[in-house]
């Protein structure tokens, strides 16, 4: 029954994603509070509401009269409030954990039954992990609330890589090279970041361990090596652009720089590779027809074709949804740039930003529900997050010196989740 319920909820999500169903999935919440205003569980409650409403998938519903029991009568009240699901949280006697149950109000089945620790130093993380679990239950992919985002900042004595939690907390610097670093890209397991770094007259490819800070130059052949993209199904394979053979082409190599393979061979500039989630295809930017446009090829370099027939004058920064159903890219809009989304066949281009400064470098969240990008809409370059359909835009940074974001893989939550029954 749980599997059947999960399949039904995923159908609802797909309908919302495709535009055939309107609105968000209503969730009623009770519990997750304490009369002690200093209790960390109150922060869990507030964060939970923010995460659900900011997910692009859920919408919390107003609490009806207090419900004393989980029965048909109480479920009817929640249904009347517009909720499709009811989430209850019971604080443990010690206050150090919360027992959670998620009810399907249509079937009255418990679809999630789990216990989560509450870390008093970061109680919000409990809510992040819970919502990520709910998103996986509904969509098949873990949510992005507990994940991190790497980006470039110009405010640290150079262009350095920084990492920030997806909620804007815990910003910290990763590189201290005092040079120009660009295009950070996370490895599939989330422990390494590949990036391009200026070393003298050469642009090298580096891989850094985010735990130790140890960095390795993997492009010992010199020249211009940029825009690394880690293969989503192989933690030992990286696509990148290089002029090592005289012209900017797309290549792949192992994570230590060996086994270099050339994929494109054309007298044009080919850059910015991006893998499909199954690693069967790669999208990239090329000016082979005179203007920089987005192309798609098989991951072995065959069947190169333009993504869309739309008469754009400039396209850049393709990024494939982890669900495989959409490709983000940047389109020139007069003197500025905006972010669009189309299917992998190039159909139904939808503009997600329009008329609010320049908007570039879009990257999908690991659940395919949100997008991080940089924009000048507030002056300078700052990071913003929006929902997959362009709604709910909110700032992540505000320093005016942040760009080139990359969303990390989803966090497992195993350090917070004590037990789970589905």
Task: Give names to the regions the model predicted.
Residues 143-145, 188-189, 232-234, 277-278, ...:
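Residue-level detector of Asp-centered blade-edge/turn motifs that repeat once per structural unit
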Residues 97, 157-162, 202-206, 247-251, ...:
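Structural motif
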Residues 165-182, 208-226, 253-269, 297-314, ...:
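Multi-bladed beta-propeller domains
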Residues 72-133:
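Amphipathic beta-strand/beta-sheet edge segments enriched in Tyr/Trp
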Residues 149, 190-193, 237-239, 279-283, ...:
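Hydrophobic beta-strand positions that form the internal "hydrophobic ladder"
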Residues 9-77, 87, 91:
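Short beta-strand->alpha-helix linker/helix-N-cap micro-motif
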Residues 7-23, 106-175:
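C-terminal/domain-edge helix-coil "capping" segments
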């Amino acid at each position: 029954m749980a599997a059947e319920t999960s399949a039904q909820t995923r159908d609802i999500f797909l309908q919302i994603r495709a535009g055939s169903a309107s609105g968000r999935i209503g969730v009623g919440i009770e519990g997750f509070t304490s009369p002690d205003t200093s209790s960390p569980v109150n922060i869990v409650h507030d964060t939970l509401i923010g995460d659900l409403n900011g997910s692009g998938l859920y919408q919390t519903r107003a609490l009806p009269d207090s419900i004393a029991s989980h029965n048909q009568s109480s479920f009817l009240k929640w249904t009347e409030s517009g909720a499709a699901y009811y989430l209850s949280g019971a604080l443990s006697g010690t206050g150090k954990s919360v027992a959670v149950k998620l009810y399907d109000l249509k079937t009255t089945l418990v679809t999630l039954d789990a216990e989560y620790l509450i870390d008093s130093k970061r109680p919000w993380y409990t809510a992040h992990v819970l919502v990520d679990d709910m998103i996986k239950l509904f969509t098949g992919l873990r949510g992005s609330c507990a994940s991190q985002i790497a980006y470039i900042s110009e405010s640290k004595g150079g262009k350095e890589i920084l990492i920030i939690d997806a909620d804007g907390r815990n910003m910290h610097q990763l590189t201290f090279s005092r040079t120009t670093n660009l295009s950070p890209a996370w490895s599939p397991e989330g422990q390494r970041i590949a990036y391009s770094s200026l070393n003298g007259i050469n642009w090298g490819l580096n891989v850094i361990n985010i735990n130790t800070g140890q960095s390795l130059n993997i492009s010992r052949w010199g020249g211009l090596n940029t825009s690394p993209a880690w293969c989503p199904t192989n933690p030992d394979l990286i696509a990148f652009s290089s002029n090592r053979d005289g012209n900017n082409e797309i290549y792949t190599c192992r994570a230590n720089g060996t086994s270099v393979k050339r994929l494109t061979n054309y007298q044009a500039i080919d850059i910015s590779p991006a893998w499909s989630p199954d690693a069967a295809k790669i999208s990239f930017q090329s000016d082979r027809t005179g203007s920089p446009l987005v192309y798609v090829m098989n991951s072995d370099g065959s069947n190169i074709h333009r993504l869309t027939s739309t008469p754009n004058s400039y396209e850049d920064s393709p990024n494939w949804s982890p669900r495989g159903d959409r490709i983000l890219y940047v389109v020139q809009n007069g003197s500025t740039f905006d972010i669009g989304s189309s299917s992998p066949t190039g159909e139904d281009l939808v503009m997600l930003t329009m008329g609010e400064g320049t908007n570039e470098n879009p990257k999908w969240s690991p659940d395919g529900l949100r997008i991080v990008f940089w924009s000048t809409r507030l002056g300078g370059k700052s990071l913003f997050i929006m929902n997959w359909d362009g709604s709910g835009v909110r700032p992540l940074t505000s320093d005016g010196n942040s760009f080139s974001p990359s969303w990390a893989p989803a966090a497992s939550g195993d350090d917070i989740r004590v037990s789970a029954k589905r």
